A protein has these predicted regions:
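Conserved PLP-anchoring active-site segment centered on the Schiff-base-forming lysine
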Residues: 97-115, 134
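Buried hydrophobic positions in well-ordered alpha/beta secondary-structure cores of metabolic enzymes
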Residues: 24, 72, 90, 105, ...
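Active-site core of PLP-dependent enzymes with the aminotransferase class I/II
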Residues: 157-180, 189-193
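Active-site PLP-lysine loop of aminotransferase-like
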Residues: 204-217, 225-246, 273-278
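Conserved small/polar residues in nucleotide/adenosyl-binding loops
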Residues: 281-287
Length: 288
């Protein structure tokens, strides 16, 4: 069901789930399964070969989590979403999906302390350089950019400074150079929709306002479907535009965007490589 034009309250309550067709239940069920039945070997081959999209294994997808992913995508105006185990996982994955050892990203220096430490130390151990800049001047992102820059990163309302990040200005600079802006929107879900201002990817810690009551830890990554990875090219974005040995040599933008006709090559790459192999897996949440 399309939710374009619906009230946010309606989207928050109903996106991604109507009712169980067999029982009529309006509550989202918890699918406690690891595996899924394929119709036949051809169906399995089609799923694994990225000819069609569907459930393969709960490490990378689950119908319960799918409701959360669809609901948040609808609220944010995203093409697709991916639930992961925590907000820190979402931040790390969002970068690792495009940057490799020897690459760099440009990040706002106004960050939550856990993210700052992750970027400064953990990503450094993986060979990914993070260049921190003062976000009050968008031009600082462009000044720090070189031919190895793969992404820009910032928080909408950084913890703890709460100084609003200039999403539109930095996103425009990024697109000029073929660089996506990734925005951690944990502090302002629904109130701010970064995709409306040009961001390519958003991340969330669902533990905060989305959960709302301190009982559930989780994270989300949303793909706006609005970034032209093919136009960015193989020199700027090799992770999406060159053969990926992690999944049989597939070229993600070519296969997902052009062959499958889906606008979320970034997210499908993340789901079928990082989530499958490294697996800070998403959770089957007890409540949506």
């Amino acid at each position: 069901m399309a939710y374009e034009g619906k009230n946010l309250e309606t989207i928050a309550l109903h996106a991604g789930w109507r009712n169980d067709e067999t029982t009529g239940s309006v509550a989202v069920p918890i699918h406690q399964t690891t595996s899924y039945q394929f119709n036949d070997t051809a169906h399995a081959a089609s799923l694994f070969g990225l000819q069609e999209f569907g459930n393969i294994y709960t490490r990378i997808m689950n119908p319960t989590c799918d409701v959360l992913e669809q609901r948040m995508a609808a609220l944010d105006g995203a093409a697709a979403g991916l639930a992961v185990s925590s907000g820190q996982t979402a931040s790390a994955y969002s970068i690792q999906n495009v940057a490799r050892a020897g690459d760099n990203i440009i990040s706002s220096s106004h960050l939550y302390g856990g993210t700052y430490n992750q970027f400064k130390n953990n990503l450094k151990e993986m060979g990914i350089e993070v260049r921190f800049v003062d976000p009050t001047d968008p031009a600082n992102f462009e000044k720090a950019t070189n031919d190895k820059t793969r992404a820009y990163f910032a928080e909408t309302l950084p913890n703890p400074k709460l100084q609003v990040f200039p999403i539109g200005e930095v996103a425009e600079i990024g697109r000029k150079h073929g660089i996506p802006l990734i925005v951690d929107n944990t502090a302002a879900p629904v109130l701010c929709r970064p995709f409306d201002h040009g961001a390519a990817v958003t991340t969330y810690s669902t533990t905060k306002y989305i959960g709302g009551h301190g009982t559930t830890i989780g994270g989300l990554i949303l793909d706006g479907g609005n970034f032209d990875w093919g136009k960015a090219g193989a020199d700027r974005q090799p992770a999406l535009n060159t053969p990926d040995p992690c999944y049989g040599g597939v070229v993600w933008d070519e296969q997902v965007t052009k062959n499958m006709g889906l606008p979320f090559a970034y997210l499908l790459k993340l789901r079928t490589t990082l989530l499958r192999a490294v697996s800070y897996t998403h959770l089957t949440l007890p409540t949506i």
